[in-house]
């Protein structure tokens, strides 16, 4: 009887122990053009998603083209928060390249605010030693206060509103919550097929590396005539390996991101 009690007690301790939580090790690059050599462990939740932002630290994150995270990006009450004001800002990346994946997060933005979520991005240096913007190589899922930011009325058919593929495909239905409220985003990338979801509704889909993709680029601000470098990079989005970085945009406005997680697909 005593032996049975001991066995049950040990089993219960093991079942409830936080140490039993699943972990996933990802390799990240710590600097521009650096190899993904630094190993970092992240929690894997019950849905099989890797929580690439733990709500407490910025491990795995750095500024685009830098070896550090700019000080205007902070951890604030469980959120990754970009603050307006003085000091260095700029776009940021999670420094591991993903190929086939589901990316989920929630965001909210200030009144009249603008930001974006990038995927399959590359760090592209200019010959003069500066950096091209991340959106020269990465599709952008728009983050916007649709009611108060002028970009919502620009572009074509609402293709600059929240969760749109920026300047190419409008998110329909347009179901974004107002500024100051949380919106949920889900981006699915698998073998070139891409979906944007907003607040649990699929709002657009498209396929990379197809004649239709090239046509969309040619009809956008990223056309071969208007911006040859962007056209070349986006037309071969993800490079030869069809993989790239996840990033968030500093557009000068306060924005918060939380519950950032990724599921790697085969």
Name the predicted role of every residue range.
Residues 1-4:
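Positively charged n-region of N-terminal signal peptides that target proteins for export
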Residues 7-14:
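Bacterial N-terminal signal peptides
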Residues 17-18:
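Short, low-complexity, intrinsically disordered N-terminal modules
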Residues 21-266:
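Carbohydrate-interacting regions of secretory-pathway proteins
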């Amino acid at each position: 009887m005593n032996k049975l009690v001991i066995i049950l007690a040990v089993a219960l301790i093991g079942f409830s122990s936080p140490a039993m939580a699943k972990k996933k090790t990802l390799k990240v690059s710590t600097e521009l053009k650096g190899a993904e050599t630094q190993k970092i462990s992240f929690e894997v939740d019950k849905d099989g998603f890797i929580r690439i932002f733990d709500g407490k630290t910025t491990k795995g994150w750095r500024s685009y083209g830098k070896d550090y995270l700019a000080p205007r990006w902070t951890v604030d009450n469980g959120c990754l928060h970009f603050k307006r004001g003085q000091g260095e800002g700029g776009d940021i990346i999670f420094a591991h390249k993903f190929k086939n994946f589901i990316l989920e997060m929630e965001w909210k933005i200030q009144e009249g605010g603008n930001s974006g979520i990038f995927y399959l991005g590359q760090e592209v240096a200019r010959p003069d030693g500066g950096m091209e913007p991340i959106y020269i190589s990465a599709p952008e899922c728009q983050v916007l206060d649709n009611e108060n930011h002028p970009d919502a009325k620009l572009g074509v058919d609402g293709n600059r509103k929240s969760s749109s593929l920026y300047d190419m495909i409008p998110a329909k239905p347009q179901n974004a919550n107002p500024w100051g409220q949380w919106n949920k985003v889900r981006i699915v990338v698998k073998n070139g097929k891409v979906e944007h979801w907003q607040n649990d509704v699929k709002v657009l889909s498209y396929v990379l590396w197809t004649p239709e993709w090239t046509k969309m680029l040619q009809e956008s601000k990223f056309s071969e005539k208007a911006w040859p470098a962007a056209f070349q990079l986006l037309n071969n989005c993800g490079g030869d390996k069809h993989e790239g970085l996840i990033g968030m945009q500093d557009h000068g406005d306060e924005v918060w991101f939380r519950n950032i997680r990724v599921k790697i697909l085969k």
